[in-house]
Amino acid sequence: MILLKLYLTLAAILCQSRGMTSLDLDDLMTTNPEIQNEIINKHNDLRRTVDPPAKNMLKMSWDNIIAESAKRAALRCNYKEHTSIAERTIGGCGVWEKILSC
């Protein structure tokens, strides 16, 4: 259920930002590289506006393995965070996700 809520919210936001009048959900899938770039660019734009500015803030980029991990966590939707370090490490990088509501 949370995926549907997130998907519809993202669809509405992206439609408005693109000036679209009709909704084609296939064009808004996060498997679409254009959508991935739009999400990453918006995220990086917002991060650049933090005040006070961060020192040495790395630019975020899309990672399909981490995206799949986030998808699996959302599909589980059991209101708990991963607890083991192994579950929170992908490709040597620490990751964390929170499911706020389902």
UniProtKB/Swiss-Prot annotation:
Location of the protein in the cell: Secreted
Pfam families referenced in this protein's UniProt entry, alphabetically: CAP (PF00188)
Residue ranges crossing the lipid bilayer per the database entry: none
Stretch forming the signal peptide: 1-19
Posttranslational modification: Contains 8 disulfide bonds.
Keyword hit for Hydrolase: no
GO MF annotations in UniProt: calcium channel regulator activity; potassium channel regulator activity; toxin activity
Family to which this protein belongs: Belongs to the CRISP family.
Name by which UniProt lists this protein: Cysteine-rich venom protein VAR9
Natural source organism: Varanus varius
